[in-house]
Amino acid sequence: EISPSRGMARRAAQQVAGNCRIVVVDSETVSVGQAMLVRVAVRAAQEQDTLEDVVRVVRGAVERIYTVFYTESMDYLLQSRIMSPSHTILGAMLGIKPFLSVENGRLQPMEKVRTRAQAIERLVEYAVEFSDIEDMVILQHKPFMSEQTRMLQERLAVEFPGRHFPYGMYGPSLAALIGADATGLAILESEIEKDDDDFF
């Protein structure tokens, strides 16, 4: 896993188990993706009748969160063992920028691009693959808008007219794994409503 937080949360829950009911849900994501789940949990707590229903809603949202990054350098990916030394050396020689996704709580290499413009375009292509997006946030590691984020917002505005997607910072724990020069997207896909008319 990316972080030991799940195990720590379970131990903490056991310590106070006698005072209240606590259910630990593995977010299987990072950074803004976790913030999206918190908002889902708050809304579910207001709308649902039981703790079980709240947990069901949150676990359903876990399956609808997708996070991807590209990073300008591979040094941190080598140190965190996300990429092998041979791939890192070859990538540095070719000047490529790796794409990463968060899959089942792990950072996984997806593909590679050669230029920043290609990386931005690939992020946009990834976003437009979704037919209905409930929420999407651009991820960066700076308090002010980076040039990559500005480019990405402009491209997303073309593909999603009438919608604005803000940017947020990913924290030091993630920066220690992927570096401080990554740009990414956290996407919460809209929940698909089941149509009872299709029942046979």
Question: Model-flagged regions — what are they?
Answer:
Residues 1-23, 29-200:
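Mixed-charge interfacial surface used for oligomerization/domain docking
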